[in-house]
């Protein structure tokens, strides 16, 4: 599940199901993007336990990609550690976009704080230049979607029901806090 599924469900349930034509257009820079991108990222976590994901990547994806499956556990561990730095992107983007740090300082932060390679750091700045504050939709959106879904019940089935409802009903991000 991801933002494409989110848009398909909104179209099916709201546009076709209820005739709410205002949902046939989705402005990229809208509050819906936080939910769309957040549910896309959270959907991975909801779909697999950590062990299931590692097994799927190791047994299916790594061989398909021609990668050594023995590297999968270490890569998963690295990604878990790097995820803890995710909000550094938001902070760097904010400082850069408001002009309190220069492009060079932002690149330095991305390399030394966010731990991106230099090439990826330059790409991130291009993303900030093109998309502005959109970067928050990924990690903040994921955390808000996760917290909302998990408050709706304790079982995996209840989480999936809440997730599906979240992805197919009109919401604004502040509704995820309730």
Language-model features: locations:
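Second-shell loop/turn segments in exported
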Residues: 24-31, 75-79, 91-97, 130-134
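A generic secondary-structure signal for well-formed alpha-helical elements
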Residues: 4-9, 47-51, 152
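Soluble non-cytosolic domains of exported or imported proteins
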Residues: 30, 34, 79-86, 100-101, ...
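Post-HEXXH active-site segment of zinc metalloproteases
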Residues: 7-29
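C-terminal, non-catalytic "cap/extension" segments appended to globular domains
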Residues: 104-178
């Amino acid at each position: 599940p991801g933002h494409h599924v989110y848009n398909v469900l909104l179209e099916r349930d709201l546009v076709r199901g209820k005739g709410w034509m205002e949902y046939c257009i989705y402005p990229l820079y809208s509050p819906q993007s936080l939910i769309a991108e957040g549910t896309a990222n959270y959907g991975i976590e909801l779909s697999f336990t950590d062990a299931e994901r590692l097994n799927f990547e190791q047994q299916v994806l790594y061989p398909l990609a021609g990668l050594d499956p023995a590297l999968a556990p270490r890569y998963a561990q690295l990604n878990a550690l790097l995820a803890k730095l995710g909000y550094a992107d938001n902070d760097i983007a904010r400082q850069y976009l408001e002009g309190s740090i220069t492009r060079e300082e932002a690149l330095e932060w991305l390399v030394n704080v966010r731990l991106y390679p230099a090439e990826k750091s330059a790409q991130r700045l291009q993303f900030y230049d093109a998309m502005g504050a959109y970067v928050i939709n990924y990690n903040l959106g994921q955390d808000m979607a996760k917290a909302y879904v998990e408050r709706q019940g304790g079982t995996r089935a209840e989480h999936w029901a809440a997730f599906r409802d979240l992805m197919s009903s009109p919401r604004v991000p502040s509704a995820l806090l309730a």
